[in-house]
């Protein structure tokens, strides 16, 4: 069990940035998403301060699919990050959060006409082209509007990032982008470059998520730059922007071995600079897109324990008042987490429990084989590292209301997303 910066133990109770879990339950109830605001800000600054170059401009985008709400986007914007958006809703949220939309990059493999029109309306700065159909539609919409927009082409490097199959994105048969080994890509690039309303500036690449091997990132840089050099030589173009995506691995359990982030970012930029020189490129900007690595460890989910049960087969369960509706990642990926009884932090962890949710679903598990003190009804159980792809992937399965989100900082807390009510559950029903 790992306590992150900002987590302390006071009289046997877990505090997050100076706020006790019992106080959080009393004020907001459970289940509850809790984020350490200082940790969010520090992660933003780690990326901004260490991914820097004297040879070209650098830009850090927040991949908002990890966790999107007005307040987290306000923080990212204040800290100088751009934003990666993938839907009408993410564009709208960033816009309403006050983002400079010129710093927004619109991704996705199936952008709709409505989404593209809205993106242009609010001034999204860059659109990332994913496929032929999308390219034709973007060109048509931009031409009709009389606007111009910067575009990147998403490419696949074929790099095998050693991660879960569902979050690999650079395989040759991935649904995203174009393979750099497909000869047809050169004709496409030439055609895009000839469009007067599309300002073709470069390429986007992303090899996957939750990657712990530095060499995967470094190899991808080399492949992208080698391809960029070929494009420039064959087509007589100058490529000015490379977006290298994200995928930086984070800690969930002791099985994970994330690299030290600041050190990696400095090493990463050195590799980018060196390979750019090796291939004779004249880049003006290099972009990265962290999401999970910005928010994951800053967030936790606080639950109340209901029942405790030992089965005939000997498995002991702790039942909590949330589950797969607020965290579907175990059901999707068999994702692993750490749990703690946050009101019994000084007691011996001498019992092995399976932490299960309240959904009417046999797969509604949160943590398998968690070592905890003896659990009782009314205990507070905290699952850590839920700050990415929990709130954003949550659902109303079993007609459960979505959870509130609270930010804590220096001994105080504030509500940033209201929890849903029963009336919210039927608001759209007819």
Kindly give the residue locations of the regions a language model identified.
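Short beta-strand segments
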Residues: 63, 150-156, 204-206, 243-245, ...
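Active-site loop/helix belt of alpha/beta enzymes
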Residues: 2-3, 158-304, 409
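Short acidic, glycine/serine/threonine-rich loops at helix termini
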Residues: 73, 96, 116-121, 138-141, ...
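A charged N-terminal "starter" segment
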Residues: 1-150, 186, 190, 194-199, ...
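Short clusters of hydrophobic/aromatic residues that line enzyme substrate/ligand-binding pockets
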Residues: 7, 14, 176-178, 355, ...
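Charged (often Lys/Glu-rich) extended helix/loop segments that serve as interaction or gating elements
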Residues: 273, 281-430
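Acidic, His- and aromatic-enriched active-site or binding-groove loops in soluble protein domains
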Residues: 154, 174-183, 309-317
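Active-site-proximal loop/turn and secondary-structure-junction residues that shape catalytic pockets
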Residues: 66-68, 89-90, 110-112, 131-133, ...
């Amino acid at each position: 069990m790992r306590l992150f910066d900002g987590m302390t133990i006071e009289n046997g109770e877990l505090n997050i940035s100076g706020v006790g879990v019992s106080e959080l339950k009393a004020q907001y109830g459970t289940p509850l998403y809790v984020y350490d605001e200082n940790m969010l800000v520090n992660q933003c600054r780690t990326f901004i301060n260490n991914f820097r170059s004297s040879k070209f401009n650098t830009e850090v985008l927040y991949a908002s699919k990890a966790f999107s709400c007005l307040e987290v986007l306000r923080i990212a914007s204040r800290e100088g990050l751009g934003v990666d958006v993938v839907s009408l809703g993410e564009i709208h949220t960033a816009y309403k959060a006050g983002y400079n939309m010129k710093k927004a990059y619109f991704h996705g493999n199936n952008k709709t006409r409505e989404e593209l029109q809205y993106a242009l309306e609010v001034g999204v700065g860059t659109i990332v082209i994913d496929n032929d159909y999308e390219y034709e539609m973007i060109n048509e919409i931009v031409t009709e509007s009389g606007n111009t927009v910067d575009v990147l082409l998403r490419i696949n490097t074929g790099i095998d990032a050693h991660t879960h199959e569902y979050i690999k994105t650079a395989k040759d048969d991935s649904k995203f982008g174009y393979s750099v080994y497909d000869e047809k890509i050169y004709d496409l690039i030439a055609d895009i470059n000839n469009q007067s309303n599309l300002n073709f500036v470069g390429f986007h690449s992303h090899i996957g998520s939750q990657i712990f091997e530095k060499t995967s990132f470094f190899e991808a840089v080399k492949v992208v730059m080698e391809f960029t050099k070929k494009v420039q030589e064959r087509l007589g173009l100058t490529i000015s922007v490379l977006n290298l995506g994200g995928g930086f691995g984070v800690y969930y359990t002791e099985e994970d071995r994330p690299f030290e982030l600041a050190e990696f970012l400095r090493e990463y930029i050195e590799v980018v600079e060196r390979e750019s020189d090796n291939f004779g490129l004249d880049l003006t900007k290099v972009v990265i897109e962290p999401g999970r690595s910005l928010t994951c460890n800053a967030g936790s989910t606080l639950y109340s324990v209901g029942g405790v049960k030992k089965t005939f087969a000997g498995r002991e369960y702790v039942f909590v008042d949330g589950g797969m509706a607020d965290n579907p990642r175990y059901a999707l990926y068999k994702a692993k987490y750490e749990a703690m009884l946050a009101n019994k932090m000084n007691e011996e962890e001498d019992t092995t429990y399976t932490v299960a949710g309240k959904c009417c679903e046999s797969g509604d598990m949160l943590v398998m084989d968690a070592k905890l003190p003896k659990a009782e009804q009314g205990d507070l159980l905290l699952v850590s590292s839920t700050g990415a792809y929990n709130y954003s992937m949550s659902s109303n399965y079993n007609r459960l209301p979505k959870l509130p989100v609270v930010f804590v900082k220096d001994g105080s807390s504030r509500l940033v997303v209201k929890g849903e009510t029963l009336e919210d559950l039927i608001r759209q029903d007819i």
